[in-house]
Structures are given as structure tokens and as C-alpha cells.
Amino acid sequence: MIGKTKKILIIGSAPDSVNATKWKNLSFDNIVTINNAWKIRKDWTNSIYPEDFPVNQRPKANEKQTLHSSDEYVEAQNHFGGFVYAGGTMAFTAGYWALFRFKPQIICYTGCDMVYKGEKTHFYGKGTADPLRKDKTLNNLLAKSARLEAIAFINKCKILNLSNIPESKLTFTKVNINDLDNISRINLNKIKEEKINLALQKEKKTGYFVPDGKYWKKMDKFEKKEIKIIDNLWLSSIQQEIEV
């Protein structure tokens, strides 16, 4: 007997995330919203945000909804190698947390392409582009995305991008939400396991692990060139056309 495919939707705050309001009869087991994205759909099940996210901007959960912050996601991110290698921004943190918490077969992203152009950078107007802040862990967003996709792969999970904007800092295969029921027909990225092994070995050897998750307090201990080598290994693990 074939088990049910567990699918998770992660919604970010990009301008196009509002397209998710039009989606009907969703077959996701959980809908995870990042920061303010809980405002997009009332049927979200999990709201995730950093510990410094303003209390007055957090949602009020009903009996079918739960709130999650650093007291949970630090453990999840550490399980998969820690923040320095994974990238210290919520788009990636939410993915690792969902992978750890739900052990799904499919994770779909929307509104998380991390492209900030024009006056309206978020669905609610102009916001802070957190992934573009000065941070050694975020110098190559494509590489951090490739890492998440590769780590999901070895955990028997596919990651897809439901956004339809032409530019993205995510490596995930773009699909139409109407095609999710025919996942076997989608031409997914090819994953190179030998490259994954090399990247994981390099991470272990480098040893940039901060147990409490507060990596920014030890930023001076991390060498840009070492992180770049690791990032390039992760990029090489995903076979796709990438515009850097």
C-alpha cells in the first residue's frame, strides 16, 4: 500500500505571495507562514518568526494553529548543520524547520524568491530586505538554497517553487500549483550525491557550528573564503541552469 504524500506549503512576504489567496481546495497537510505572511491566508496552520519579530505583529492562533520561534527552529537548523552553513534568514530556517518537524515528501515555497525591486518589496509595501543584510552566511543565497534542496533530497523530500516571477534566489524547480498532483511528470533538478558528500565533509572539517544559534556573535571567527568554498560545493550539487 502506498502511503499518502505529505505536502507542506511555506508562504513568504514577497509581493506575489498574495497569489496564494486565490488558491482553492489546497491539499497541503500544513501551511507555514513566515513573519507577516499569516495575513495572506486564514487557513495557515503554523506561523514561524524570529525572536525579535514584534509581538504586536504576531498572529493570534486558534485551536488549529501554532506559533513557532527560535526556541524550536534553532534545534531544527542545528540538526541539519547549523546557521552558518544553512544561511541565517527565515526563508531557509522555515524550510529546515518544516523538514525536521513534519518529515514531508514535498515542500512548496511561494513568496520567498528574495528579489527586492521597486518601492513595493513586500506584499504590504516596502519592508526590510533581511536576506540582503551584511552577513557572511548570506553572501550567496543561491548556494544556501541549493544546500536546502540537497539536504531535503537526502531526507527523501522534494522542494518546489510555486512563484511565477522570472527572477529568483531559489534553485527549486518552478511549478504551477495545478501540477502538484502530477509530480512524477515534472522535470525536477538533478541532485549529485557525490557533491553533497563533499560539501558535508568540508563543513565538518571547517567546524563553523554555533549551538545556541547566535552565530552573529562569533562572526569574526568565520572566514569568507571558507564559506565560499562550501557554497560553491553546494551549488555544484544541483544540476540546473542558474543565473548568478
Q: Where in the sequence are the language-model features?
A:
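Metal-ion/cofactor- or nucleotide/acyl-coenzyme-handling active-site neighborhoods
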Residues: 1-244
